Amino acid sequence: MFDVTTKYLASAFVDAESIEYEADNLRPLLDALGDSELSAQNLVQITQSGLKKRFRFEHIGTGDDLQLLGDRFDVTRKHKPPDGENMGDVAAFCEQAAELLSGSLDHFGRKAHRLAVVIDGLLTDLNENDFVVLADRLLNAPDLGGGPPFEWNWRIATKIERSFGQFADETNTLVHIRRARVTMSALGQPLFEGDTIGVSLDINTNPENKAARYDSDGIRAYLGEVSTWMDDLWNRTNSFMFGE
């Protein structure tokens, strides 16, 4: 999809303000998640009522970060230098995220009211002419009296009804494209430095519907379909960007 995939994020928005870290609940929660490679980590969330300790786990193999916050449960996977081999494809990530999110919600007897998946990546194999052509296509920018723009942002959002499991819900579908200079390094050694196109793809259900309705089956259904939606979204975006 991208030259470098930098982040996957899967989120289940849930009323979980009352769920705080308790040592006595750590082992039962780990048993419910059923993954021996999860390691408990420290997490303190700043809330309107003060600091609260929350559950957090890191997956030893993939580096997935599971955070059970007061208003959302997140699974995040970030690119590990030098080669990002931990990222895998989005379908495999969503499959693992579905188990972590649904296991967490089931353990605490909760349902989510909103679901979201975000993919961030970089296009690095571009020359200066590619940047100029892309800026012309996306921006229709005014002539400011200098050279072509070296930094810019472009963003679009639309609503699409999508079916998954027993649900047919309206989703927000967003694409964010930006030019920026990026430096990537590992152990103090530079891996990449230069201009890139950053792309963020985001598909999430209607934030205005606060009804707790997504149980574990709903989460698995959503995350089982979203990789296909993301592939289609990227194909449409890539075709628009480069005319391919």
Each language-model region and where it sits:
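Macromolecular interaction modules
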Residues: 1-15, 170-175, 201, 206
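N-terminal low-complexity, intrinsically disordered segments
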Residues: 1-83
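Short amphipathic alpha-helical segments
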Residues: 25, 89-100, 218, 222-225, ...
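Short glycine-rich, low-complexity/disordered patches
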Residues: 39-52, 102-126, 145-161, 228-244
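Amphipathic N-proximal alpha-helical interface segments
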Residues: 56-80, 182-207
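Internal, hydrophobic cores of structured domains that mediate oligomerization or house catalytic pockets
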Residues: 71-143
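Aromatic/basic-lined ligand-recognition segments
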Residues: 115-200
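Long, compositionally biased interface segments
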Residues: 190-244
